[in-house]
Every structure is written in structure tokens, then in C-alpha cells.
Amino acid sequence: MKEGKARLTVLGTGTSQGVPIIGCKCDVCRSKDSRDKRFRASAYIEYGGLNILVDAGPDFRMQMLAADLCHLDAILLTHNHKDHTGGLDDVRSLNYIDKRASEIYCEQNVLEDLIREYPYVFKFPKYPGAPEWHIHVIDDKPFMIRKDSSDKELVWIHDVGYHYRLPNGTLIPTARCLDDMIENADHTGGNDGVEVIPIRGYHDKLPVLGFRFGDIAYLTDMSSIPDEEFIKLKGLKHLTLNTVGYKTHHSHFSLDETLVLADKIGAEHTWLTHLSHTFPVHEQFCRNLERMCAERHVRSMVQPAYDGLVIE
């Protein structure tokens, strides 16, 4: 499959609390500008004919409705925090529409947390109506995503739940043990899918992943990136990078740290995400960034992302 150019739609640019924050009366939280309304961080990527989601937090349902999306070929998880995984139950609608299990790509430690946090998904025999997930375990090595990576058709049986329909018409339960739901990601390459390049970072001490799709990279919830990872970020047109606030933070990049990284990586455009209400309203923030980048000679155009932004 020819990968071609990637197109990224920003579905959410907020912190774990979103913006506005419950009970806050600051200028940003009371702003009428839609660009100051921020769902939890997430992105939708169209790449090589595939529809790919990065992270499915508590706002997943509203984000899918806002962007008028009804099909996903893959869901990539950056890490195991609830603001990035808390909406995964809502893939049930996609299971029903597509008649396919949702293809979820995550690291082993994330999978272990999903098993604890969504026990009904992994319980056997399966509870009728539980989401259908097919897990691909990834690490920091490039991996392949293929369209309809599972060719098994889901059939809903009322009061019983989903079954797979075999080519001969026989119906079998979707999963009878964990091994039926989990496999290692495909690192073999080939021409019948798209290659995704993971970027290792750390969220304080927690290992997390960002992802590169062609000339677009999406990084969130990082406070450090190992030196050996920067080679994966060369030649970018667009970089999306988390920036939680002005002050140094133990698990997120501050604005000063982000501007240093934007200059070091040198993407044509750097978009800031995972933004808190401590930054000013959108228009003022844009002016502030323009001035700061000019003063520091940052070799990238740095702007705040906003929900609904499309970059390509």
C-alpha cells in the first residue's frame, strides 16, 4: 500500500482535566473562542488509506461525533493514563457498524493496565455487549498497520453477544482466552500496509510512545526524549508536542523546554498540545509565541494547536 501524505486532525488539545476546568472562572475557562475549548488530547490520522486514532480518552465519544467519524482501522495508545484510555469502552458502536473487532496497538505495560481497568472485556466467557478488542503489542520499533488486519466478521446474537462467522458460515465465540485477543505487532514491513515509527519518551519516569506518520509526528505527555530518538524526528513538516504550562513540570514539557525542542528538531511547523488554562486566550497566546520565537531565533513556526485543527 502506498503510504503517501499524512493528514492529521487534532481532536483534543487539553490536559487531563480539559479546558474549561470544572469550577474555574479564569479568562481562558470563560472564553467564548472555540479555540479555547479543549477536549482531552487525541488525534486522528489519515495515512495510506487508513484511518488511525491516537488515544481514546474520556472525550472519545464527543470527539468522534464532532469530527463526524464512524470508522477506525487502528487505535494507537501512547500510554496507560485515563485521559488517554478512558473512552475505549465506546468502541462498541464501531464494532457494531464495522462488524470487526477494534484493532488496538499498545505496549505490554499498557495492556496489563487495560486488563485491570476493563476486566469485563477480558473475562471469559465474554459478557454480551462488551467491546471487542484485538490487541497488537508494540514497542519502540517501527510496526505495520494493515487494513482489515482481522478478516473475521463479527455477528451479533441477541442476549448472547458477538461471534465470529467462519468462511463456511459456522459461528464461534469471539474469544475463549487471552491468547485469542492478543498478538505481537507486525515488524516485517511489506507493501500491503503502512509503517508507523514510534518515538520513545518519558512521562516523568513512565515510558510512553509518540508516533511518526510520514512527515508528521505526534508527541504528547512527555517530559524527556532520549538522545537516540531524535534521528527519528529528522525532516518533519509538522511536529505536535505537549506543552503543559510556563512552569517546569515533572511529567510534561514546559513552554521554555518546548521552544528548545522545536528549534532542535527543526520541523517546518510545531504545534503545541496538551495545553492548560494557565496560558492566555488563543489570540494572545499566538502573539506571545511569535514574539518569543523571534527573540530566540527558533527555527520552526510554533503555534498553539486547537481542537479541529487539520494539518497536512
Region roles according to the model:
Residues 60, 225-226:
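Short, surface-exposed beta-strand-loop junctions and turns on beta-sheet-rich folds
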Residues 1-219, 284-312:
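Binuclear metal-dependent hydrolase catalytic cores
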